[in-house]
Amino acid sequence: YKRQGDMSVTLHRAFDVCVDPIETMEQAISLGINTILTSGQRNVCLQGADLLKELVEKSQGRITIQAGSGVGAEVIRQLYPLTGVRAYHMTGKRVIDSEMQFRKDGVNMGLPMLSEYEIWRTDVDNIRAAKKVLEEL
C-alpha cells in the first residue's frame, strides 16, 4: 500500500471480521489510513459499543473510528455517550411499498431474502434528525 497525495482512505467493514481489532487498528494507523468504518464487530453498531469505545480510547485520535450499521438519530444519541464515537455512516433509509399492482406469490425475481415489493430510499427527515443530534453533541 502506498498512499497517494491527500486522498482520504477508509478501511471499510472488512475490519469487522478481523481476528484482532486492536492490532488491525494499529496496522491501519501505520499505513496512514484515516478512518475505520466499523460496527464494533457486531451486526449493528449499538451491539458493538464496547469495542467501539475501546477503539476510540486506544486510537487516541490517531485515526477516526466511524460507526456504521443500524445508525440513525436515536442510535447516535445512545451510542455517543457510551463510546465517544463522533463519526457515523448511515443510509437514512425508509422503506416504501412498491406501487406494483399484481403480485405473484412464490416467484422471486431477485434475492429470496429481499422483498420484491419494497423500495429502500434515503429519507431527508431521517438525515435531518441525525444531523440535529450530531450538532447537539
Task: Report each predicted region and the residues it spans.
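Glycine-rich phosphate-binding active-site loops on the catalytic face of alpha/beta enzymes
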Residues: I33-L46, T83-K104
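Catalytic cores of alpha/beta
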Residues: D16-L31, L55-A67, V71-M90, G106
